[in-house]
Each structure stands twice: as structure tokens, then as C-alpha cells.
Amino acid sequence: MVFRIASSPYTHNQRQTSRIMLLVLLAAVPGIAAQLCFFGWGTLVQILLASVSALLAEALVLKLRKQSVAATLKDNSALLTGLLLAVSIPPLAPWWMVVLGTVFAVIIAKQLYGGLGQNPFNPAMIGYVVLLISFPVQMTSWLPPHEIAVNIPGFIDAIQVIFSGHTASGGDMNTLRLGIDGISQATPLDTFKTSVRAGHSVEEIMQYPIYSGMLAGAGWQWVNLAWLAGGVWLLWQKAIRWHIPLSFLVTLALCATLGWLFSPDTLAAPQIHLLSGATMLGAFFILTDPVTASTTNRGRLIFGALAGLLVWLIRSFGGYPDGVAFAVLLANITVPLIDYYTRPRVYGHRKG
């Protein structure tokens, strides 16, 4: 009789994986609630579309590979992938975009590598980057937060815009994106980058409606604080470790502070970097993915710091206003190298 030796890991704990994924899904509730509050019902519709698409895509691949569909879907990883992608895209993006991004994330970025535990890149961020590169206009068409919006779509209008491109009264995305100053709005990070390139001073930019009276932009600072609250709860539940979020946020804050001190007229202040865009979502929910992050404590600190540095560089000097997704994927590439040089020394072995 011939015994085959399978590749590691040799022990699997389906219940533990399912529990951690469920905790992460529960921790996302404050962030989702904040996005619903400031950006409307479109976020919920996108989550539903992404969740159904993720489950169907994963079930299809598992069926083709003749693996147990029910047992694998119970680990909740497909749901989490769909959720993370859905909250990362504009709430009123066309329905086919979130479906396309989710299917690509699950089938190409996850199952093509062998499924959960085998993928080297974060599937949700792969899906996001594919959409961003392919459809940059739709992926950057965020609504203004309700506090500065002229037109606030209801639940029915949100569904109609997502599936047809227009509200019941005939309004389109250009109408819905108008702010109280009559100007089409963008995210705080996008507004800052575009305005600096147009020659506006930071002092002028901070007087815009999206920044006026705010630390880091209307709506967005509260969304980030909500994701932070969910992340702290994950730490308390010991579902994630502190190394990656802390090193990521400290590095981002340090780089932003130094940059702002040296060039206050062209670079954003640290609070804008920390409380705008996908900062807290990335720190606690994306970078901490146990499959694609470093596996040693020292490695996690390096991994988080590298991602923080990359986010600041992309936001400050790159072509995209946020940069979290690109930073995550670039950091994922370095994980084997980081783990190799930070692996703990075996007891009894002398140092190289």
C-alpha cells in the first residue's frame, strides 16, 4: 500500500475558521451602519449582490472540482470576500460591477489557487483593483455624504440607479453627486489630490464643504471611526492580533506627519490620512487576513509598516487618491520574503 503525503497544514479546524469569519462579519456592522447613514441604501444593495454572487461563484467552482459545497460554504470566507468588496466600492455603482468583481475575486483570486488558505493575494482587493483599473469613472463616483448632499436617494431610488442608472424622477449620477455648493463632489482624498494639482493651497482646500468644520472630511471620519470600533472589538475577541493594525497606523501617521511638516502646502495632514478613505477598514479587516499576511510577530510588524508606507506614498505622489488596495497587494507579494527572514530560530540551533 502506498501512502501519499499531503502538503501542510496537516490539521484543519473548520469550526475555528468559521467562527473567526463570523466574528469579522459581526465586527463589520458598525462600519456598514455608518456607511448606510452617510451614503444611503446603496451600500446594503451592493452587499446583498456581492454576497449572493460570492456564494454562487464558490459553489460553482466547488461543484466542478467535486468538493463538498455545503461544508466549504459554511466557513463564511466567501461571504466575507463579498462584504469587503461591496463596502469598498461606490454605493450606487452599476449592479454588474460588484457581480463581476466578486466573481473574479472568488474564482480567479481564491479558488484558482486551490481555495481558502492557498491564495497569496487578498481576493477582495484583487477584485477591487480589477474594477478600478477597468472602470475608473464608475469606481470613483462616490456620492457626497448626506450632510452636504443636495439630493439624497431613498431605498427605491438606490435600487433603480444601481440597476438602471436613473432614479424614478429621471435623476442620474451627475445629479445625485451635487453638493450644497452646486459642485459635483468626490471623496476627501480625491478632492485634496485634485485641488493640490490645480494649484489650490491646503488652507483653501480645508474650506471646501466636504472638509469645513471636520477633522478629515464630512461623513468619512465617522465611517472610519465606526470601522475602528469594529476593529477594536476584533482585538478584544482575539480574532486578530494587534501587530499589523498598530504598525500600519503608526507608520502611516508618522509618514503623514513628517510629510506635512516639510510640505504643509501640498501634503495632507495626518488626521486626513487616518480618518479618510479605507484606512481603518484596511487596518483591521483587510491587512489582517491570516492567509495573505505575514505569520510571525516580527513579520506582522514589518508587513503592517510596509503597507502604511505604501499607502502614504500612493496617496501623496501616486495617481490614485486612496491606495489601500494597491498597498495591500504589494505587501502581499513580500510576505514569503518577510516570513523567511523573520522565522523564529529553532531551539538549540546557533544563530547563523
From Swiss-Prot:
The complex is composed of six subunits: RsxA, RsxB, RsxC, RsxD, RsxE and RsxG. Its cofactor is FMN. Belongs to the NqrB/RnfD family. It is found in: Cell inner membrane. Part of a membrane-bound complex that couples electron transfer with translocation of ions across the membrane. Required to maintain the reduced state of SoxR. One of its GO terms (cellular component) is plasma membrane. InterPro entries: NqrB/RnfD, RnfD_bac. It is a multi-pass membrane protein. The keyword Transport applies. Its EC number is 7.-.-.-. This is Ion-translocating oxidoreductase complex subunit D. The chain crosses the membrane at residues 20-40, 42-62, 89-109, 123-143, 215-235, 242-262, 267-287, 301-321, 322-342. The modification FMN phosphoryl threonine is found at residue 187. It is an enzyme of class 7 (translocase).
